[in-house]
């Protein structure tokens, strides 16, 4: 698996495996990465996060290995603590993930991703389309659509501006 991931990376594509199916997309462009950086810079603890002990530890673009074997690489993963893994895919389930839509990969980010993440136990899934300014916020109990800029309160006690 690691060899396949390395070869994909060298070829200039990001490889993910969801439910046994390989999904790929081109490496992100400047606009995409600027949005990721802007969102990450806004992530803060709320009072709930303080009382719950959530550190709002956020990491961009790392592999997450889910219990059923899928391998995803969210644009931003938010955890309540620093994951243990440093040199391999992280196995701790993120509290929240944020995806920034890449042109041509809207279906992957807006339709496949949210359903998958929620099934795996991620509590908040936020998807931002920088071309339309759509902000999709999905939870087990509901889905909302908003227009950027918007402040999102996450269940874990973190907040971000998308």
What are these regions (language model features)?
Residues 1-162:
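Gly/Pro/Ser/Thr-rich low-complexity, intrinsically disordered segments predominantly at protein N-termini
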């Amino acid at each position: 698996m690691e060899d396949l991931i390395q070869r994909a990376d060298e070829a200039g594509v990001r490889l993910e495996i969801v439910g046994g199916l390989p999904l790929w997309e081109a490496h992100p462009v400047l606009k995409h990465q600027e949005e990721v950086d802007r969102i990450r810079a806004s992530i803060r603890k709320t009072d709930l996060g303080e009382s719950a002990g959530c550190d709002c530890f956020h990491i961009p673009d790392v592999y997450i290995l889910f219990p059923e074997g899928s391998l995803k690489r969210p644009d931003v993963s938010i955890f309540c603590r620093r994951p243990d893994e440093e040199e391999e895919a992280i196995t701790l389930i993120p509290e929240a993930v944020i995806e920034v839509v890449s042109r041509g990969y809207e279906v992957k980010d807006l339709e496949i991703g949210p359903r998958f993440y929620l099934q795996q136990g991620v509590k908040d899934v936020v998807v931002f389309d920088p071309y339309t300014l759509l902000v999709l916020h999905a939870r087990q109990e509901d889905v909302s659509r908003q227009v950027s800029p918007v402040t999102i309160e996450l269940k874990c006690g973190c907040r971000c501006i998308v």
